[in-house]
């Protein structure tokens, strides 16, 4: 039975010291003080889908001194007009909020901190709220930019305890989502904003969004923003329910989904009263940084973003996405997923996305008991120019990917699987991919993906896929000397001579082949550019993610 979040759901790497720029930013996050208003922005990789809102004619908070920038002055400015800026002096200033700033959902509001303002909830109150009563109709809302939101706390009002004698029933908080911002049926545009140490309630099957929670909204777009140290039962940083989401050039680090049990409806939970609906089980724990649920929403897009060191207790260490029966599209482009962890799906859990498009991205050093990098269920998977390196399934199957019911319209092209592991002893195998592949695999390399059960299929555990111009290494299993399962019918066995994961140009780290690698000039019909954005040799391209 599949995990869910929301109203209607069912169901040993060497890492180069030359770190990706976004990771270097991430290392600085923990040292920033609460008074520092805006952390270093992530690198700009993708064209932003929105620009900062204009601030002409603003109502100004303050008269040039920190003492003039008070909570009452802020509330007066918000009440007086739709555009708010600040004049608190040259130094960073913090405005402590003692109650939630409630904004009108039908009037466009702009709040611009100028890079020096922090709203701080002291771990006691949600910071901002805007609620419209309808479902996906309202296009007005909030543009928030150049500011920090810290220590916000969503406080629940209804807790459902565990059911005596039925551990499968759901329990936890029925409300208490959105520690910094709560939005319903309203637009939210976020540009260059830092979210730190905000929290939603936990546990609970449907509460979430330690920093941001948005329900039934047509447009949530987050650009050039950082999320560090946020937590909630689901979606440690962001929770979207029936909401269209766009993420560009964002950094998510050290966020946690702290719920304690996978969510499901029916089956083992039959007879439960449920926290949010009848026959519901579980208490959350999905989506360490981001959780997205819905069938009414549109496509979800992530571009140029970095997810590092996020954790979840259940599914999707970085991001959890279920599209319910509507099979909405999900895309990841030029993004990095590194050192995330979960019980299942160390980086991603994605269900019923058609298509699920992954382009020019890197998944490295993610860990889970099963599906070290990604657990993909019922998706039409389309992967191009992507690297899976050093991901680990610690007690199960699929060191990099675990696939269930993948659609025939999918493909894997010009992709590198290297150094992934399925550890945990006997019964652990499929270090690169576990599951059925019903689509072609072309110009792809499977190199040194190792399983603890050395006598079982090491790299791929499924009936061989179709395809062409693929390379696999090694050929022999370490125990028994048998030939390993082929990942693709007719695959060539050769040592690809790949280097360690490193910054080789482009927005994401890659593993480049040596000058005399058999991957060079061995591919055909490759993507026009490689993972770094470098043009490929059209006649004789290189197998794998890097030309």
Regions found by a protein language model. Name each.
Residues 152-174, 197-208, 253-286, 311, ...:
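Acidic/polar low-complexity surface segments
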Residues 41-50, 508-547:
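Surface beta-loop-beta hairpin patches that serve as ligand-binding interfaces in beta-rich domains
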Residues 75, 79-80, 96-110, 118-145, ...:
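Extracellular beta-strand-rich solenoid/capping regions of secreted or surface-exposed proteins
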Residues 61-85, 525:
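Acidic Gly/Asp/Thr-rich repetitive segments characteristic of extracellular carbohydrate-active
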Residues 87, 112-114, 120, 130-131, ...:
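Feature marks extracellular polysaccharide-active and adherence modules
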Residues 101-104, 126-136, 157, 179-185, ...:
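Glycine-rich beta-solenoid repeat tracts in large extracellular/virion proteins
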């Amino acid at each position: 039975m599949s995990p869910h979040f929301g109203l209607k759901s069912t169901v040993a790497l060497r890492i180069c010291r030359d770190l990706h720029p976004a990771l270097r930013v991430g290392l600085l996050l923990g040292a920033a003080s609460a008074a520092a208003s805006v952390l270093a922005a992530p690198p700009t990789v993708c064209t932003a889908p929105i620009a900062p809102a204009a601030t002409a004619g603003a109502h100004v908070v303050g008269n040039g001194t920190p003492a003039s920038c008070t909570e009452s002055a802020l509330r007066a400015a918000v009440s007086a007009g739709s555009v708010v800026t600040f004049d608190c002096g040259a130094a960073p200033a913090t405005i402590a909020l003692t109650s939630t700033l409630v904004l009108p959902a039908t009037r466009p509001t702009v709040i611009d901190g100028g890079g020096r303002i922090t709203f701080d909830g002291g771990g006691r109150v949600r910071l901002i709220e805007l609620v419209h009563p309808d479902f996906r109709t309202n296009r007005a809302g909030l543009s928030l930019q150049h500011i920090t939101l810290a220590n916000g706390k969503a406080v629940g009002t209804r807790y459902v305890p565990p059911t005596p004698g039925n551990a499968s029933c759901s329990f936890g908080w029925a409300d208490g989502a959105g520690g910094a911002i709560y939005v319903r049926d309203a637009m939210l545009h976020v540009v260059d904003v830092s979210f730190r140490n905000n929290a939603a309630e936990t546990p609970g099957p449907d509460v979430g969004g330690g920093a941001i929670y948005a329900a039934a909204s047509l447009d949530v777009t987050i650009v050039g923003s950082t999320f560090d140290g946020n937590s909630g039962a689901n979606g440690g940083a962001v929770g979207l329910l029936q909401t269209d989401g766009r993420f560009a050039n964002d950094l998510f680090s050290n966020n946690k989904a702290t719920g304690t049990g996978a969510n499901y409806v029916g089956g083992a939970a039959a007879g439960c009263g449920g926290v949010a609906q009848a026959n519901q089980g579980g208490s959350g724990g999905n989506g360490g940084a981001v959780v997205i649920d819905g069938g009414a929403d549109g496509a979800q897009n992530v571009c140029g973003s970095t997810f590092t060191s996020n954790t979840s207790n259940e599914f999707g260490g970085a991001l959890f996405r279920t599209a319910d029966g509507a099979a909405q599209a999900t895309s990841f482009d030029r993004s990095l997923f590194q050192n995330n962890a979960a019980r299942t799906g160390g980086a991603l859990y994605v269900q019923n996305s058609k298509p699920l498009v992954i382009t020019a991205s890197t998944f490295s050093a993610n860990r889970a008991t099963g599906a070290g990098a990604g657990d993909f269920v019922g998706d039409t998977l389309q992967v191009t120019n992507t690297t899976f390196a050093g991901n680990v399934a610690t007690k199960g199957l699929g060191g990099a990917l675990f696939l269930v019911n993948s659609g025939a319209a999918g493909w894997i092209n010009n992709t590198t699987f290297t150094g992934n592991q399925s550890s945990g002893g006997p019964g652990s195998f499929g270090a690169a991919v576990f599951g059925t592949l019903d689509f072609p695999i072309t110009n792809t390399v499977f190199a040194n993906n190792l399983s603890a059960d050395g006598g079982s299929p090491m790299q791929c555990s499924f009936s061989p896929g179709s395809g062409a111009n693929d390379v696999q290494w090694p050929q022999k299993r370490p125990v028994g000397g048998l030939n390993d399962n082929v990942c693709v019918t007719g695959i060539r066995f050769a040592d690809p001579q790949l280097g360690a994961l490193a910054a080789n140009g482009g927005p994401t780290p890659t593993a480049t082949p040596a000058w005399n690698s058999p991957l060079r000039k061995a591919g055909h019909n490759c993507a026009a550019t490689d993972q770094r954005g470098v043009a490929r040799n059209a006649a004789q391209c290189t197998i794998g993610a890097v030309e």
